[in-house]
Amino acid sequence: MKMPFNIGLIHFVGVGGIGMSGIAEVFHNLGYKVQGSDHVDSANVERLRGKGINIQIGHHAENLGDAEVVVLSTAIKKTNPEYIAAKEKHLPIVRRAEMLAELMRFRRAIAVGGTHGKTTTTSMIAALLDAGRFDPMVINGGIINAYGTNARMGSGDWMVVEADESDGTFLKLPADIAVVTNIDREHLDHYGSFCAVREAFRQFVENVPFYGFAVLCLDHPEVQSLASRIDDRWVITYGTNPQADIRFLNLSMDGQKTHFDVFIRSRKTGKETELKNLVLPMSGQHNVSNATAAIAIAHELGISNESIKKGLAEFGGVKRRFTQTGSWRGIEIFDDYGHHPVEIKAVLYAARESAKGRVIAIVQPHRYSRLYHLFDDFAACFNDADTVLIAPIYGAGEAPIAGFGARELVEHIKMAGHRDVRLIHCLEDVVLIVSTFAKPGDYVVFLGAGNITQWAAALPHQLAVLDNNDEFSVD
């Protein structure tokens, strides 16, 4: 049974989060009564308010008002006053993934999972389905530039969603098609062990119904191992691996564009198909890999090669995925969400491939627990940056862990062999270093899932101020 419209007012706690805001927006657009709260104002909050949704800043019991259902983001703890009030009122309390699952019951659904690349891959699948005139509903973990939002209604039969594995609730999503881009050591604070992470992704794939299929990246050893354990579902593999069903090859970089070919071999029919001279307006092999996952689905759903080619060429990207925020004296400045060592390594490799000069990475480590679990991996992921600037850790509500701070990370990266790693404290430090050290052709790349994005947005202006010999300041 689909969710009835007479369930009453739905209250979203933590509605400003990227996943929650998209779900709230879609429920509002479907005609449900929606309100919410968040601990801080944000662009997502303002976007929802612009649609007429009432949102309170700060978490207080009275925010619930006449709510009949309460939806919690994964970040909300049981000590939250709105959670406590909902329990006292005996209201239904629903996790974010459960509400997303309710939306998925309305459509045929594609769920994109993996420890990295989910947001970009989700956006690319949406772009190719758009190009094929499928007009999908989309709920993503990032702002899709073509839409200006992370949620889109769509009037077609298909829905594309990002499947967040961080708390295990992605196993509740009823997907007809499941994508797994990669499986790395992540969210160990929730799962407890990497074996539990592996098992969760196996279950994610096996949850696909017999009439659906999974799309798995054969370039990743853990995903290839997963593919070998799936014997009762239809699996399509992709990557550079010669054994993959859908291979991408002949890559060449041209600034912020990548040219490549795709070769498709159907295990069912034996038919072979070539898509040559594809152009993706993004740099990096990791982005071509994500695009190939999208191509696999589009091809299987019968979208023409011409539409696939057009959809890729016109792909507008995702906010905070190697997004250029400005330039100064020939120095290009970028903002990226990458915060796991695998993501950081991929972004810096792409920057190295396309930059004419040096690569300067400004990194804000995200969560003490992640740094603790992946300390050695962080030491080895910056090799493609000529200079690494480590900012204070963005704790995201976590308490510091002794011996695993920004200063210790700087020393650990140096011990691993990097020649130029520096500790910084504020944006003024970045302005000073870039203005005196960087040269035309260099890339300055901000990396992190926290508020370092504000630095990336502010840096071009702060550098421009120097040209006028004025003092600069940062709020």
From Swiss-Prot:
Protein localization: Cytoplasm
Give the E.C. number(s).
6.3.2.8
Tell me the leader sequence span: none
Q: Any one Gene Ontology biological process term? A: regulation of cell shape
Superkingdom in the source lineage: Bacteria
A GO cellular component annotation here is: cytoplasm
Hey, which pathway is this one from? Answer: Cell wall biogenesis; peptidoglycan biosynthesis
The alphabetical list of record keywords is: ATP-binding, Cell cycle, Cell division, Cell shape, Cell wall biogenesis/degradation, Cytoplasm, Ligase, Nucleotide-binding, Peptidoglycan synthesis
An MF annotation (GO) of this entry: ATP binding
Quote the record's binding site residues for ATP: 114-120
> What is one Pfam family matched by this protein?
Mur_ligase
Where it mainly occurs, coarsely classed, is cytoplasm
Q: Which family does it belong to?
A: Belongs to the MurCDEF family.
Record-given protein name:
UDP-N-acetylmuramate--L-alanine ligase
